[in-house]
């Protein structure tokens, strides 16, 4: 089942993205040059518009019988999702701004706005007490990933030429044109396609457009894919020309390699280095072999796994595409809808779904015109994204109004305030210990810090102090004593604080009670058990 799920999910993931290719790769119909349409679409640098993505899932409720009520409610919540983006302004590849909303079902929604430049992104969320900012400089982004940032080694490296945005864009356009001559021109027409004139509102203005409509089902997609691969394999001359063209572009722009800090493979000098002609032939041969292997793999699927193929790419899988093109061959409006009914065969079913629909819509105006996006500004009160990565769930909740929709979603639906700490009985470092009198003791520092509490040691009083911000609880204990002071009140615990291998251990049930948590034991395997302390704050 896992193997089939992997194959099925990969096929499904390609379907929607292929639809535009179906449209753009067609041979000219009704005097519309679709190859030019795609090339222009790939070269759009500025635009205004609006977009939406909608997902609807019809679950088989029988598959969820016995699930907790909270999980059922969450499944229903995500069964209908819509991301709506309005007032989208794309100034260039680095600067944009938009307003949007994430809609759950028919009523629940969270509004937001986003402003981005080449160095900064600022998002405001409805219900948030302050905006969230993300530093987009390379050093900051590397820091988020945990990759160390090293200083520039020498002046030579620091002086490395950088390609400006205009140069990179021009290079990209050249490569699109070169690759498109082979990859796009070999695209076959889908079987069902219609082209007719239409008048559609774009930004509220009635606009004369050419309407391209395509219908596809699973078997038609498979037929189209085989025809496309066959055409690519047959056009060896086109492949050779494409590869030679790409290599010519790369060889003619040595500053690209310098900007990347990579050795230019086209630089002459080494005696045994391959010639440019040899490199082109080697690359072209490798792609040709890959395409031939793909062609054989498609045939193999038809013979050895036809049942899965017929179930996944069945007539119950449909794609409808409506693309509206103006007289400049710019795409102004797009509507794509994918519908899928999973297999009724339990061995082939990948999810407990009765049906799935994905709908994508967009409108565009002022295409490649003068567009000015709103400029992001980081205020002093803004929360930086890197802070969120280290925040406990309860601290994240404090960034939102308790009466807001997003607070309710995070706390009561997604339960980000849930915390748990687990130990295996065979852990080599600070395992849970069951004492001879039957009391379970656990390491105090590990417990406190993983729950977000702060632990300190007072050398003068020799007291260990734990402050738990989530519950506003203060606990003071001493080594060797079974007395604890919880929020100023002295209580007796079931076992004295004990040092084991340098770590202070405390009775689990007592510390859990003081911190508003519960404890539990579960079997893992053979003689190994898992001890867990958990709470929701």
Protein language model features and the residues they cover:
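Bacterial N-terminal signal peptides that target proteins for export
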Residues: 2-12
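A low-complexity, Ser/Thr/Gly/Pro-enriched, surface-exposed linker/loop concept
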Residues: 472-487
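C-terminal motif of bacterial Sec signal peptides marking the signal peptidase cleavage site
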Residues: 22-25
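Extracytoplasmic/periplasmic beta-strand context in beta-sandwich domains
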Residues: 526-528
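Long, intrinsically disordered, low-complexity Ser/Thr/Pro-rich regulatory/activation regions
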Residues: 487-499
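Sec-dependent N-terminal signal peptides
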Residues: 12-18
């Amino acid at each position: 089942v896992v193997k089939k799920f992997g194959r099925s999910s990969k096929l499904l993931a390609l379907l929607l993205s292929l639809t535009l290719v179906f449209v753009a790769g067609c041979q000219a119909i009704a005097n519309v040059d679709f190859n030019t349409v795609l090339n222009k679409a790939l070269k759009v640098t500025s635009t205004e518009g609006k977009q939406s993505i909608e997902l609807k899932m019809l679950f088989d409720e029988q598959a969820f019988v016995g699930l907790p009520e909270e999980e059922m409610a969450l499944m229903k919540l995500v069964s209908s999702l819509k991301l709506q983006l309005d007032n989208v302004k794309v100034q260039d590849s680095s600067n944009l701004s938009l307003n949007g909303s994430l809609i759950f079902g028919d009523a629940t929604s969270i509004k937001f706005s986003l402003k981005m430049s080449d160095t900064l992104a600022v998002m405001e969320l409805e219900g948030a007490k302050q905006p969230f900012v993300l530093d987009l400089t390379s050093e900051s982004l590397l820091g988020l990933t945990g990759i160390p940032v090293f200083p520039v080694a020498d002046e030579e490296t620091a002086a490395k030429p950088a390609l400006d945005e205009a140069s990179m864009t021009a290079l990209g356009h050249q490569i699109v044109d070169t690759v498109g001559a082979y990859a796009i021109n070999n695209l076959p027409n889908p079987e069902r396609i219609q082209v007719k004139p239409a008048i559609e509102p774009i930004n509220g203005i009635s606009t004369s457009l050419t309407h391209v409509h395509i219908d596809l089902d699973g078997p038609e997609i498979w037929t189209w894919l085989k025809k496309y691969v066959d055409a690519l394999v047959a056009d060896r001359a086109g492949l050779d020309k494409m590869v030679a063209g790409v290599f010519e572009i790369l060889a003619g722009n040595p500053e690209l390699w310098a900007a990347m800090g990579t050795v230019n493979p086209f630089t002459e000098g080494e005696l045994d280095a391959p010639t440019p002609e040899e490199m082109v032939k080697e690359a072209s041969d490798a792609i040709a072999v890959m395409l031939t292997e793909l062609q054989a793999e498609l045939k193999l699927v038809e013979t050895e796994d036809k049942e899965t193929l017929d179930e996944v790419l069945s007539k119950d899988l449909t794609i409808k595409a409506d693309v509206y093109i103006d007289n400049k061959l710019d795409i102004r409006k797009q509507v794509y809808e994918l519908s899928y009914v999973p297999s009724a065969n339990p061995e082939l079913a990948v999810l407990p779904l009765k049906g799935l629909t994905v709908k994508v819509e967009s409108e565009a105006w002022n295409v490649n015109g003068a567009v000015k996006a709103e400029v992001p500004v980081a205020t002093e009160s803004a929360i930086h994204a890197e802070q969120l990565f280290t925040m406990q769930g309860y601290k994240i909740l404090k960034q939102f109004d308790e009466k807001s929709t997003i607070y309710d979603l995070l706390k009561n639906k997604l339960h980000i305030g849930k915390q748990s700490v687990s130990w295996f009985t065979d852990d080599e470092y600070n395992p849970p210990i069951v004492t001879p009198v039957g009391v379970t003791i656990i390491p105090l520092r590990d417990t406190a810090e993983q729950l977000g509490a702060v632990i300190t040691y007072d050398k003068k009083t020799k007291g260990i102090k734990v402050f738990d911000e989530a519950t506003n609880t203060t606990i003071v204990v001493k080594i060797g004593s079974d007395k604890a002071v919880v929020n100023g009140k002295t209580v007796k615990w079931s076992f004295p604080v004990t040092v084991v291998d340098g770590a202070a251990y405390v009775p689990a049930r007592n510390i859990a009670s003081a911190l508003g948590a519960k404890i539990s034991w579960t079997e893992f395997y053979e003689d190994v058990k898992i001890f867990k302390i958990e709470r929701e704050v």
